[in-house]
Amino acid sequence: MNPAHLLILAAVCVSPLGASSNRPMPLNLYQFKNMVQCTVPNRSWWHFADYGCYCGRGGSGTPVDDLDRCCQIHDNCYNEAEKISRCWPYFKTYSYECSQGTLTCKGGNNACAAAVCDCDRLAAICFAGAPYNDNNYNIDLKARCQ
């Protein structure tokens, strides 16, 4: 089976199983993953899924570094997008383009899709500019993210 299809299947299956204190796995994860791969082609997107205090599920405490701060800003951006009527960023898909490492959100997106696309685009650009520290991958959240 295509890895992309497995990713979508996992997102659909895992999201209802999460604890109530955790946000559901985003269904637009596939698009965000592709944006990250556009701006950071030399590192697997998976390295960003469990990084620091904010990259991945949840988010609390002080970001451990600039990359983690990118994820905190992305979380806050989604919180702002949720203020748009009937906008659920974790489930919203959008139109965008990747060309030679440059991301562009397309003009045909409605207000919610445009906001979510811009959140993801800015996060992917931020990831590209922030150093990656292997010591901040898969950290003990209880110990380091209070």
Swiss-Prot record:
Main localization, broad class: secreted
E.C. number: 3.1.1.4
Binding site for Ca(2+): 54, 56, 58, 75
Propeptide residue intervals: 22-27
Keywords noted in UniProt: Calcium, Disulfide bond, Hydrolase, Lipid degradation, Lipid metabolism, Metal-binding, Secreted, Signal, Toxin
Active site annotation, chain numbering: 74, 120
UniProt-listed CDD domains: PLA2c
Pfam families: Phospholip_A2_1
Cofactor annotation: Ca(2+)
Superkingdom, natural source: Eukaryota
Gene Ontology cellular-component terms listed: extracellular region
Catalytic reaction(s) noted: a 1,2-diacyl-sn-glycero-3-phosphocholine + H2O = a 1-acyl-sn-glycero-3-phosphocholine + a fatty acid + H(+)
Annotated signal peptide: 1-21
Localization in the cell: Secreted
Details of cofactor binding: Binds 1 Ca(2+) ion.
Tissues in which the UniProt entry reports expression: Expressed by the venom gland.
SMART domains attached to this UniProt entry: PA2c
UniProt record, GO biological process: arachidonate secretion; fatty acid biosynthetic process; lipid catabolic process; phospholipid metabolic process; positive regulation of fibroblast proliferation
PANTHER family: PHOSPHOLIPASE A2, PHOSPHOLIPASE A2 FAMILY MEMBER
Protein known as: Neutral phospholipase A2 B
Native source organism of the sequence: Naja sputatrix
